[in-house]
Amino acid sequence: MAIRFFDMFAGIGGFRSGLEAIGGFECVGYCEIDKYAKQAYEAMYDTGGELYFDDARKIVLEQLPDFDLLVGGFLCQSFSIAGARKGFDDTRGTLFFEIARIVAVKKPKYLFLENVPGLLNHDSGKTFETILLSPKSCKLFGERRHSIADELLTACGRNE
């Protein structure tokens, strides 16, 4: 039986590529606001029958099928050293809370999220702490008894 997943902030499908290479995963839907990334995603993957949302803030929870795993690389510009590092003062910096909104209702067994190293040290670590300890996150992680592991990896996959 396949593990069903929802691909948030899908980009061109990095998470999906890895999951499909492993095998045993089935995508039930995806979310990507960039039209060119969406075109590439749809050119590379058979998305027929999958639910699509362009904007994470407009995801209608009642329309989402059940899934076991939510994967996503929520937007990093607000935390990256290459950007202005505005954190939660930039709307893009608040999109993690859309993940929390979805997970609170859909209750997948697993979350697999990625972001830039700057998320860990933005605002002296307070941003990452807020994400982990916000009321939504505490309710979500406490209720589901998720264990949280964060790891800083290089592009080659080795720990730093």
Model-derived segments and spans:
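SAM cofactor-binding core of SAM-dependent methyltransferases
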Residues: 3-58
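Class I S-adenosyl-L-methionine
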Residues: 59-67, 77-160
